[in-house]
Swiss-Prot record:
Molecular function per GO: DNA binding; excinuclease ABC activity
Taxonomic source organism: Ureaplasma urealyticum serovar 10 (strain ATCC 33699 / Western)
Location in or out of the cell: Cytoplasm
Annotated protein name in UniProt: UvrABC system protein C
InterPro entries registered for this protein in UniProt: ConA-like_dom_sf, GIY-YIG_endonuc, GIY-YIG_endonuc_sf, GIY-YIG_UvrC_Cho, RuvA_2-like, UvrABC_protein_C, UvrC, UvrC_RNase_H_dom
């Protein structure tokens, strides 16, 4: 422990708050909360420690702390700080790991949607749902049974789904309320009423010799029963609650959440984490803060935690976080813990191997480049169509893992002397001129997709900005496969295709290429639409964007029926559009 850290530790007060451990590069590597900051921070340096906690402690060179009024405030602050900094040694939910929901919008004419974000102000949510494939089948089935609104058209307009008898169009609010009530019952596992309705429709169709619809209703009954029942475990009571089980071994932690609705298990989610802190209560609490900040929360959560954290979570989410108190709750909690053990045993080898491969790849890259830290890597790729519509994409790796929230897209403005060289100069200049002007931290490494040309262009841009950041290129072979690292001095290091470093860099190059090319395709499609259709009378920017969001190409637009297009356009504009499309 250095003298600076010793001095700061002596000055920490016996008050609640958050502490931020930093490494020798001033990077925040771990964030925690405490009822007593002094006692909690000193506990890291007192007494025996396991290997992973020792690894964390050995990297601690400095700290910051923030004092708050109570543990509840500390819990909220900790969650916000973790979201912002995503420290290396914290438990982090994977980016985009939100579980799916089936949602009924709160619009005047409600729609049924399959979504991965939860916002209680936008509608009624059912979930979270674990099995994406099965639950998407359920979504399609519900959409076929209940004719919710299928589009964004005005209520006086009929759409293609209306003609297929799959869209209600304009109806009385009571009709929607009835459909919503039926969906709620289905998600409670109460199928008797809807199955009776479908059976009645089947018999009515048979009586009319309408065997096609009779078969459809029979298949809907069978599919609905299978999908719902295959995902349910029935309890002997009618409670709704979540159960959190966990298991820790060899510095790895499995957390499982069971979601029960009206006595039926609707969902099981599981995550595995490497852990570097010995306070399991704090780790579980941090995870639950992240999880329930982006997923729907039950009215009761049963979890084995200390009273302080249970109270803080309850106050934060305004719901009950409790220890198992009844015999029944203890049995359910034991089931969750048993499942966590089974999940650990079946998945831990894969988790450890992936983490070891990532650590080894980063260590190999550090050795090659003689860099002590690679916690932040920014990777660039430019793309264009014969030097027109130039764009660039930037992806960001934090501690070796892609953080999609930090990715950026650039519409490049270079027109004079347009070339790959000048496009690279522009994007590097724009990116780091902004970081410097906003006093933001620079990355540990810049990676450009390309060879000496792209590397030299990026170096020139950095020189003009008078900043120094380590930089390499990733060069492909004649088969367009990742082949070599191009150093700033122009030297090339051929990669061993069997190495973990090759796998890491090849994935990085593919990720940035796919990110950039996807952006270019969207821009190209929009450009074609604009150039071909900008003179269609009545087709303004708003309507054109609606068509762009729905149709991938001019050919798709040409093959669309009038019924489809009338969802977006008045009849007179549709006539003008058809005249234009017939000339293309």
């Amino acid at each position: 422990m250095n003298d600076l850290l010793k001095t700061k530790l002596k000055l920490i007060p016996h008050k609640p708050g958050c502490y931020l451990w930093k490494d020798e590069f001033d990077q925040i590597i771990y964030i925690g909360k405490a009822k007593d900051l002094y006692n909690r921070t000193h506990s890291y340096f007192n007494g025996p420690k396991d290997n992973k906690t020792s690894k964390l402690v050995s990297n601690i060179k400095d700290l910051e702390y923030i004092v708050v009024n109570n543990v509840n405030e500390a819990l909220i602050l900790e969650n916000n700080l973790i979201k912002t900094h995503r420290p290396k040694y914290n438990i982090l939910l994977k980016d985009g790991s939100n579980y799916p929901y089936i949602m009924i919008t709160n619009e005047q004419y409600p729609r049924l949607k399959y979504v991965r974000t939860y916002d209680k102000n936008k509608g009624i949510y059912f979930g979270p749902l674990a099995d994406s494939t099965n639950k998407y089948q359920l979504f399609n089935l519900l959409n076929s049974i209940f004719p919710f609104n299928k589009c964004n058209h005005q209520p006086h307009q009929k759409c293609i789904y209306y003609d297929l008898h799959r869209c209600i169009n304009q109806v009385q609010p009571q009709t929607y309320e009835k459909a919503i009530a039926e969906v709620k019952e289905i998600f409670k596992g109460n199928l008797d009423h809807i199955l009776a309705i479908l059976e009645n429709k089947e018999q009515h169709a048979v009586a009319k010799l309408d065997f096609e619809n009779a078969q459809k209703y029979a298949e809907q009954q069978k599919a609905l029963t299978y999908i719902i029942n295959s995902g349910l475990v029935q309890l002997d009571n009618n409670e709704s609650f979540d159960v959190v089980g966990f298991y820790e071994k060899n510095n790895y932690l499995v957390i499982i959440i069971f979601n029960y609705v009206k006595g039926k298990l609707l969902n099981k989610s599981a995550d595995t984490f490497a852990i570097y802190d010995h306070e399991i209560n704090e780790l579980i609490t941090s995870f639950l803060m992240q999880y329930y900040s982006q997923n729907r929360i039950s009215t009761k959560i049963i979890v084995s935690l200390d009273d302080d954290n249970l109270l803080a979570l309850s106050q934060r989410f305004k719901t009950k976080f409790i220890n198992a108190q009844t015999k029944f709750h203890k049995q359910i909690l034991k089931l969750a813990f048993d499942n966590a053990i089974l999940y650990f045993d079946s998945n831990i080898k894969s988790v450890i191997n992936k983490q070891n491969e990532l650590d080894e790849a980063l260590n190999q890259l550090k050795q090659i480049l003689k860099l002590p830290d690679l916690s932040m890597i920014e990777c660039f790729d430019n793309s264009n169509i014969n030097l027109s519509l130039p764009i660039a994409g930037m992806i960001v790796y934090q501690n070796g893992k892609l953080n999609n929230k930090l990715n950026r897209k650039y519409n490049l403005m270079t027109t004079k002397n347009a070339s790959d060289y000048h496009f690279m100069i522009e994007v590097i200049t724009r990116r780091y001129q902004r970081l410097v002007s906003q006093h933001q931290k620079l990355p540990n490494l810049i990676v450009v997709d390309g060879g000496k040309l792209q590397v030299n262009a990026a170096l020139y841009a950095l020189e003009q900005l008078q900043i120094s950041i380590p930089l390499i290129g990733l060069k492909k072979d004649q088969k367009h496969k990742t082949n070599a690292i191009v150093l700033a001095n122009g030297d090339e290091i051929i990669l061993d295709r069997k190495s973990v470093l090759y796998k890491f860099l090849a994935n990085m190059q593919n990720d940035v290429h796919n990110y950039a090319i996807s952006f270019l395709r969207n821009k190209h499609t929009k450009s074609i639409f604009n150039s071909l259709l900008n003179d269609v009378q009545g087709l303004g920017k708003k309507r054109l964007n609606e068509l762009l969001n729905y149709y991938d190409s001019i050919n798709d637009l040409k093959s669309a029926s009038d019924q489809e297009l009338l969802q977006f356009l008045p009849k007179n504009v549709l006539v003008n559009l058809r005249e234009k499309l017939n000339k293309i």
